[in-house]
Each structure stands twice: as structure tokens, then as C-alpha cells.
Amino acid sequence: MKQLTGAQIRQMFLDFFQEKGHAVEPSASLVPHEDPSLLWINSGVATLKKYFDGRVIPQNPRITNAQKSIRTNDIENVGKTARHHTFFEMLGNFSIGDYFKEEAITWAWEFLTSDKWIGFDKELLSVTIHPEDEEAFTIWNEKMGVPKERIIRLEENFWDIGEGPSGPNTEIFYDRGEAYGNDFSDPELYPGGENERYLEVWNLVFSQFNHNPDGSYTPLPKKNIDTGMGLERMTSIVQDVPTNFDTDLFMPMIGATETISGEKYRNGDLEKDMAFKVIADHIRTVTFAVGDGALPSNEGRGYVLRRLLRRAVRYSKKLNINRPFMFELVPVVGEVMKDFYPEVLEKKDFIAKVVKNEEERFHETLHDGEAILAEVIAKAKEEKTTVISGVDAFRLYDTYGFPIELTEEYAEEAGMTVDHEGFENEMEKQRERARAARQDVDSMQVQGGVLGEVKVASEFVGYGTVATESNVVALVKNGEYADSLQAGEEGQLMLDVTPFYAESGGQIADRGYLLADGVKVLVKDVQKAPNGQNLHKVVVEEGTLTKDAAVKAIIDTKNRSSVVKNHTATHLLHQALKDVLGTHVNQAGSLVTSERLRFDFSHFGQVQADELEKIERIVNEKIWESIDVEISQKAIEEAKEMGAMALFGEKYGDVVRVVQVGDYSLELCGGCHVDNTASIGIFKIVAESGIGAGTRRIEAVTGKSAYELMNDQVGLLKEAAGKMKTNPKDILTRVDGLFAEVKQLQKENESLAAKLSNIEAGNLTDSVMTVDGVNVLAAKVNVADMNNLRTMMDDLKNKLQSAVVVLASVNDDKVNILAGVTKDLISQGYHAGKLVKEVASRCGGGGGGRPDMAQAGGKNPAQVEEALAFVQEYVKSVSK
């Protein structure tokens, strides 16, 4: 057999099928952008659904790919078995109504057995087929020459996921030899059984039937081929190693972990071997997922990443690694995969930062969490129960960042289980609290009742006009149809034509008025009705508004003008964030009002001051360049080909609205915008903050609001300069001078305090008492803080040579206590930490520390003298 690397096998597969007329489909992102049914891309065919279901006709009906994939349904098995992975590559060849069984089988056999390609010994290959698939049997037996005893008929060789395309499949197995099993009395020792000897190499699915709703099967007019070969498994066979982890796709990460830990892989310790495997698998998954735009969080795919990283950190402790280290493996993954996935090395710095940040977050709470979990397990055992309560599991998740699955693994090792239902109940309570906190009492929350029945047409024309002649086509009051609204009454209405924008896409609704003879109606808010019309929330200020009334609908143009400036500014900001922070930045939410804009985006850490400055400057430069804003309607595929940014998770129709700011920004957006960036005037960032793991928020203002903000800041600067008796341009010099003066005064003050402390310490030596042969000093002193107290303690210990000393000071009703024990007395059982804890407890406080020096605090200054009196009792108790 040839000696090949994993990278060579991958390339060889693609080259082979390219020679057979296949188009090579690039590996798609792990984050599915067109399939909301998937959390991750989990197979080679997952990205080709659009071709198989007919939504898109491929240029070439023959396709081959090497698709990176993630499956996380059995994370707990990773590391325990030879071939379970969360990240893997699936090699496949596909036919969309072109060739079928004969070509698929012939080419698979050629690729595996030809000396030009893999070069397997034909005698070591067996195949399985469906019992009724005589066509496949004939091809294997008569054309490929596979003896009938190596063609096994299995009922499970039928691919069916319910309604839709289905069909039989054939699998090819490689015999690894007797070293992996020679007990032929084992009922599982056959190709297709659960064993380590016969490994599945390739699965060929023949989609030839349609599974109908009534359960029947009818032939498909166009038959398809869908095959899959796991690269990791194939590599383990070619490289003749016992598990996938022993291939060159994993060993570099395992080797790097050996270097970091000082431990050895395959050194006879199965528990440590499992840790090496878990780390190698999980870092591959996290590296690729972060590179494709996913970030750790507590929801969805972000939760999967958090769980994987924290599981790896947990296993790293078995290798005596007690610090963040996974981030150091990111460039190792990049090197292994660089031939086919060069983007990993290109993004390695960013990916490593994300991983390190997440590791550091977990390490901060890991120790405390493990201690709490140990207490929970101990308590459960005392109570003779083998179940960890849902409340405790939720506390570990919510406070210490322990994914429920991690708690379950710890519990399993202790012979216990977790009350998963109780945990989910606690999670739901938290979600309810969050939902209650988010509710906006001013928004139109309820749109049920008669609103769901209203299906009259309503056309929005507000992109191009700010006022229209309209008719009231529906009127609702108190959730019921109404014929009229009187002055002072509130209601909801629809217009046949409206210039009022309904709140959506982060942009707030227009406000304004409806006017008619003797009638004036304030439009307070506009939302989408259940059937998609613009629903206006109104208050009648004058007259009576009737259904079918003709009105003039006029929006507040001043308000709209401010809103559109802020909306276009969010588009400029989005692109500037990508330019400065990286292409991983994606919009996570926004709010566009007339006063300000708020933009939430994915990013792993705080945006630095210099980065914010750069972002702000870029946006302003684009404003000052006076760029025209062009808006057009495009087919969704055309818009994506243009590179238009789509908001992840949003559903778009076949035709979309594209907002283009010159050649700088291109987004799909249904909102209102300026005609030219110059209209925005100026852009000023007000704040940047984190609103959750992996999500940041920028708040900013534009136009008049930005001018007023800057005016206020200049006013404050002038006021500060006046108080410092200087002018604004010299204020920094003046501040530096004041800091220097303060520093000098602090130095002089500390020097003076030290002298006074020394004097007081000298005086205190006269107060030393001898208790059972031990020098004891317990005194209340006048010093400013704990630092001065320590200085005095050092002086006294030096002067007395052998003593137990406790000093206390009171400042602003706060008690500081310091205990010291000289070295000679520590060996006799005296302990400063234990002593100071007892003293502090007698004046309402607590503390502790080392045997030679310890500090504490108290809350009751009036009890200090009484507390200090205890010192003599303590010395007597130890000397007995």
C-alpha cells in the first residue's frame, strides 16, 4: 500500500473525480447560511441540497467535494472510541440526474484498487448491499469481480429519512487483518458488524425512489448518486494505525500537547490517552468553527463551542495542565490543514485570541465550580441519593459556566446522574425572567383578535414620499372593529396607501399626522400587522375619525431625516468594523432612532481605544467623501454574487432590496436611507460595551446630535480649564503638573507617616507584656491605612525579635487589624492567621492569612479594645 498523508489522500480523491468530469465544489462554511434546519454543516451532501431538490440547477451535474463537517450528537464518546469526532472531513462524489450505479461503483473500485490511486489489495475489500438490490450485486460480482462470499446482503443498507428521495446503498469495507480480531465465533466479526477489523471505507447511496406520504415508493424520474468517504478513517487505514487519532491529521496536536504537558501519549495510561484525544479533536472543531464566524456563547452553536472548549480544559487537568493552552494549538491545526484550508493560518491570530479569551474565562471559575460540585456530590451521597438536583446543576451552569453535559460527565465518574428535567425547569424560569425584563410596555405587544382577520391591501410608499392622500381602510378600538374614533380616543388603523415606515430591521417607526377637515390624528407608532400591513397606532387630537375617511398622511420629516442619517451610518459602521477588527464581525442587532444609533456585533473582546478611533475616522471620511447611496431591487442570488451582506438568521425573498454606498458598503436592507453620505454630517461614537459573550455594542450619534455632544464636551473642557486657571489647549500640561505635585506630596506624606509610625512603634515597645514567657503586644494605633500598619509591624518585629503582635487602627468607622508572629514562635504553634481571625470576629469582622503575618477587618470600632484583650487569652491557650 502507498504511504500517503491525509492531505495527499484528500487531493487524490478530488483529482480522480475531476478526471471523471466532476466539478470540484469548494468546502462550504461550517455555519449554514441557507439552511435554518441545521446548526452546523454536518455532511458532504448538506451543502448540495439546493441541487438535489431542484431549487438550483448546477452548471455541471457531476460534483465532487471535500466538505468540513461538525456533528455533536455524541460528544461524550469522543476520546473513548477509535473513530468518534466532532469535526471531520467528508469526501464525496455526486450525480444530479446524470450517471448512476454502474459508474459510481466502477469509479469507487478504480479509485481504491488502482495502483495509480490508492492501490488497496482487492482481496482485502468486501461490500454490503441491500438484499433486493440485484443490480448492485451484478455490478460488484460480474463487472468488478468481487466474489459473492464477499458481497454481504444487509437489510439496513437502505437510505431513508422519511418523505422524499430514498434508495439502497452499498458500503465498501477494508479488512485490517487478524491483529484487529480473529475470533470468528464473535457474531459481530463481519463487514458491517460492530468490530475493529472490517472498517467501512466508503458509502454509496443510490437515490432512485421517492418515499410518498402514504408510505409507498415510486421510481424517481431522475436518479441521483450521493457518496461519502470519511477522510480521517481512510487515512487511518492507509497509514496502518490503530485509530484515527494516530494519523498525521491528529498527531501534530497530540505532540504539541505532549510538549506543553510533559506527559506522553500511549504510555500505558488510558485515561491520559483519552485526554490527548479529546484535546486534539476539540481544538480542530473550535479552530474551524471560529474561523467560519461562530463564537462561544450560551446559545446555539456558540454553546457547542463553549462546551467543547470547557470539556477540553477539564481533560487537560488529567495531563497536569492548569493554565490556558488550547490557543497555542491553533497554529498547529493551521499547519496540518494549510494545503486545503489556508484560511485557518490566515486567521490564526484571531482564532487564538477567541480561544484564549474563553479559556481564561473558564479558568477563573473552574476551581470554585469544581469545589462546589464536590460539595454537591458529597452532600448527595450523605443523603443516600445518586441524583444531582436540577437546581444545583443550574447553579453550576449559571454561576460557574459549567455546561450541563460537563456536570453530567463529572457525575458519571462519581456514579451519579443529573436531574436533567429539573435543570431545564430552572433554565425556563431564567428565560421567563429575561422575557419579562425585555418587555416594552409602550410597544404594541398584542396583535391578535380581529387584527389577524384584516386582509385589506395596504401599500407602503414611504421610500420616495413623505406625504400621501390616503383612505382609512380598517379601524380598530380596544381590540374590536370600530366605525369611528372620537377626540381623545386611541386606536389602530390601516391606510390603503401610507408613507409611514413600520418598525423593522432595527429602524424605529415614523411618526406624524393624519389630517382632514376638522380632524387631526397623531400617529404615535407603526408596527407590522399579522398579515403584513402597516398598522398605525393613533390618538385623535381633534374631531372624529371615521372608517373610510379620506386623510392626508404626513410623516414628521424632521424625525425621519435624523433616522435615515443614523441608519446609513450603521451601514458605514458595519463595514468599518470589518475593516478594523476583521471579517469575523457580523451584525447581531441594531436600533436606529432619531436621537442615536445602537449597533450590536460579534467580536470576542473589548474594542481598544485606538481601534474605536480608527473606526470613527473611517466612517467620517466616508461621510465627507459625499458618496451617493444607491438603492435597487435584485434577485437574491444576484445580490449575493455582488457580495451584499445579509443579516444572519434573516429570511429573504427571491427579490431583495440592496443598499449600496459607493464601492464601500453593500447590504440587503429594507430601511430608509440618505441619498448621499454628506447628509449625515458627522459621526461620533458615544460608548462601546459588552452585552454578552462574544457580542459587543457601539452607541453613536450623527448630525445635530453629534454636534450638540461635541459642543457639550468643548464646554466641559473650557470649564475645567477655567478651574485650573489655564486655557483648553494647555490643560494636559496643567494636569500633568498637578499629578506631579500630588505625587510629591504623597511621597512627603508617606515619609512623614513612616517617621511618625517609627516613633509610635518605639513608644509601643514600652507596652510589651510577658505572658507565659512570650512577649505580647496588642495595641490600637493611629495610622492612615493598612500599608502604614504593615510598616509599623515590621519595625516592631525587628525591635522585639521574639513576640506576638496585634495592631488595630480605626479610620472612617472601618477597623484594620494586623497580626504578626516572629519565626521562633511559629514553631511553637502560634499562628498569625488564626489569631487575627479570632480578634476580628470580636469586633464584627473576619480575615486570615499566613502564620507569620495576617490581616483582617472589622465593622465595630467600639469593640476594638475588647477584641485586643483576647490576644493574651490566645497566647495562654497555645502555651498550655
UniProtKB/Swiss-Prot annotation:
- Gene3D superfamilies the UniProt entry points to: 2.40.30.130, 3.10.310.40, 3.30.54.20, 6.10.250.550, Bira Bifunctional Protein, Domain 2, Threonyl-trna Synthetase, Chain A, domain 2
Supply the alphabetized keyword list: Aminoacyl-tRNA synthetase, ATP-binding, Cytoplasm, Ligase, Metal-binding, Nucleotide-binding, Protein biosynthesis, RNA-binding, tRNA-binding, Zinc
Q: Which reaction does it catalyse?
A: tRNA(Ala) + L-alanine + ATP = L-alanyl-tRNA(Ala) + AMP + diphosphate
- Which InterPro entries does the record cross-reference, listed alphabetically? aa-tRNA-synth_II/BPL/LPL, Ala-tRNA-lgiase_IIc, Ala-tRNA-ligase_IIc_anticod-bd, Ala-tRNA-synth_IIc_core, Ala-tRNA-synth_IIc_N, Ala-tRNA_ligase, Ala_tRNA_ligase_euk/bac, DHHA1_dom
What EC identifiers does the entry list? 6.1.1.7
Q: Which GO terms fall under biological process for this protein?
A: alanyl-tRNA aminoacylation
Q: What class of enzyme is it?
A: ligase
User: Required co-factor?
Assistant: Zn(2+)
The protein's GO terms of the molecular function aspect are:
alanine-tRNA ligase activity; aminoacyl-tRNA deacylase activity; ATP binding; catalytic activity, acting on a protein; transferase activity; tRNA binding; zinc ion binding
Q: Does the keyword Zinc apply?
A: yes
Q: Which HAMAP family match?
A: Ala_tRNA_synth_B
Query: Of which family is this protein a member?
Result: Belongs to the class-II aminoacyl-tRNA synthetase family.
Q: What does this protein do?
A: Catalyzes the attachment of alanine to tRNA(Ala) in a two-step reaction: alanine is first activated by ATP to form Ala-AMP and then transferred to the acceptor end of tRNA(Ala). Also edits incorrectly charged Ser-tRNA(Ala) and Gly-tRNA(Ala) via its editing domain.
Q: Could you tell me what this protein is called? A: Alanine--tRNA ligase
From which lineage does this chain's organism come? Bacteria, Bacillati, Bacillota, Bacilli, Bacillales
